[in-house]
């Protein structure tokens, strides 16, 4: 609050601007962060950025059985899905680490502004 008892809009705007900059920096960090989910003991791996976007999929040739193409295709599909889920779990953890403190800052509200 300012000396007149009203809201200090300048302070509120500065705080909002600072939070926006912190959010943008955290989002940039997430874009640059890489995680690798894997399955099948490493036969399949999926690389994702911190926002959860898949950037690479790697399948070890040992995962392929040339004598049973149909079974191999289904197995590989299952392994890819499991690797993606593993990567998503890691992404969620990273997002909580990077964005959690900012979300808590929002919950703290703006001084002198009830409920915000």
Curated annotation (Swiss-Prot):
Put simply, this protein is called: Nucleoid-associated protein Tfu_0045
Any one GO molecular-function label of the UniProt entry = DNA binding
Assign the protein's first listed, main location to one coarse class: cytoplasm
* Pfam families per UniProt: YbaB_DNA_bd (PF02575)
* Subunit structure, as described in the record: Homodimer.
Entry keyword annotation includes Cytoplasm: yes
Q: Where in the cell is it found?
A: Cytoplasm, Nucleoid
- Gene3D superfamilies linked: Nucleoid-associated protein YbaB-like domain
Which family is this protein grouped under? Belongs to the YbaB/EbfC family.
Q: What does this protein do?
A: Binds to DNA and alters its conformation. May be involved in regulation of gene expression, nucleoid organization and DNA protection.
Instruction: Cite the entry's keywords alphabetically.
Output: Cytoplasm, DNA-binding
What PANTHER family would the database entry show?
A: NUCLEOID-ASSOCIATED PROTEIN YBAB
This protein's GO CC annotations: bacterial nucleoid; cytosol
């Amino acid at each position: 609050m300012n000396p007149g008892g009203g809201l200090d809009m300048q302070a509120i705007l500065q705080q909002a601007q600072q939070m926006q900059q912190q959010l943008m920096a955290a989002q940039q960090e997430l874009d640059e962060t890489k995680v690798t989910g894997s399955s099948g003991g490493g036969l399949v791996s999926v690389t994702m950025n911190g926002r959860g976007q898949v950037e690479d999929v790697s399948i070890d040739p040992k995962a392929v059985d040339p004598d049973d193409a149909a079974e191999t295709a289904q197995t590989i599909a299952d392994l890819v899905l499991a690797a993606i889920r593993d990567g998503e779990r890691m992404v969620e953890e990273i997002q909580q680490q990077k964005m959690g403190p900012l979300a808590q800052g929002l919950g703290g509200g703006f001084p002198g502004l009830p409920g915000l």
